[in-house]
């Protein structure tokens, strides 16, 4: 039998989760989405500097999703063995390294390899986040938490354009903005 005190404690705990955990997960999803679409913004400068044509970019976009597709199941199987917290942190570190490695792109092949690796690294992120929320949010609050989490996707599109535009005009040393 639940008492009014128990219900109040549960309500306060859920509120804390929404105020403390969900914004962090939201931010991680924004970073994930921006990382996925950033090459679309960098395309114009990359075309000029590297000489890539539309076919190279189209193939690179497709190869990302091939890596994403092929590594979703293995990533989720590992997620169960390693643990959600460690697995998501590891994925983010790997995709950060892969994203940083984009500065070394000189050929279409290197572009394809890095796009595939980025897709593979990001494959387990979204399912892992949903599982993570399942562990933290009770069933009565989970749908609302996931719905709020999902709004990070369109928000990333809104804030990603200006951020990408600013990054493209930055030139540090001999490094291009992309």
Identify the function of each model-found stretch.
Residues 149-178:
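Helix-loop-helix hairpin linking two adjacent transmembrane segments in secondary transporters
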Residues 70-109:
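Conserved MFS/SLC helix-loop-helix module at the cytosolic interface between two early adjacent transmembrane helices
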